[in-house]
Amino acid sequence: MILPRTNDLDFLGALVHARCSTMAEGECLDHLCRLHNLSELGAAVLPGVEFLGTADFQHRLVQQLVQELSVYLGYLRGVGAEMLNWVLSRFEVENVKVLVRSLATHVPFQECQKYLVSLPYQPKRTVQLAQGTRSLEALIELLPSGMDALRLKKLWNNHREPFRPFFVEAVLDGTYFRELVMRTGRLPAEDREWVTPLVLQEVDTFHLMLALRGKFHYGLTPENLLPLHVRGTRISRGRFAEILAAPDAATAASRAGDRVMDAVPHKQEANTGESLEVAAACEALSWKRFVRLAKHAFRHGHMALGQVFGYAGLRRVEVANLITISEALRSGVSPAEIRSRLIPRVGMEASYV
């Protein structure tokens, strides 16, 4: 149950500090990577919780995060509450992306219901998502208020054939990020100081992945991708156009440079396989910077929104890491290899910029 809005940042700060002390990071992650199976992992991170396989374990991790952030929402009001509410709305967007994939693979929506996340403040939304929706247009109606429906329809209609889930999901992400940037700009100056770097880092990671994966892997053109640019970040529209015009993934990464990463991967010859390697390396380096910024906001944001959103960012990374570990344990990957896949990654070669 969500508590009444009190804007009690002192109490909320105490809550997130207590939770952060139990977060799976550092040596704790090293230990989890050495576990033998999913049962041991579940006992370590979800003690006393029964789950049915890897997918159910992962779903419970995400649902737990949603429940936690929903409780924190009850301690905020005004622009802080609006901002955290939009962070939670990201999970509604992710629900729609699950259904987009079901459209592409012709899997009945009802079979996807187990993968959808339920938001406590909108208990009926998940059921609505999985019932009777048979088109992209119908899915738009189920997106959270704040998503620009007209923009979504225009972009989708311009690139309807062939149906490309990557592009549809990118349109959803870009539209979500536009609103996220706008809500960040409404925060008080003392809060923007801590929250803005986190938001811009995530959005510019999105920009870079549009080029590295959208162009060099999925074959989308700069004309397809340039309209997805989100204004107000460190990668301007002009710079984004230069990144999209790069002849290979390594050049595109170098053109993004320190706007997204503290380091860039060593330049490699451009072919399909190595382009994917560049994309994976850049994504890891981008999220490594995100973790650094989130920790800085959490530790130095005092009893302000920066601390709350820094913590929320760290929790998202924690969940992503635990999901990665669960997948690797199912596949029988070695502990060293598992650790190399986590955020922040270890043992990566890079050229500093």
PLM feature spans:
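N-terminal domain-start signal
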Residues: 1-353
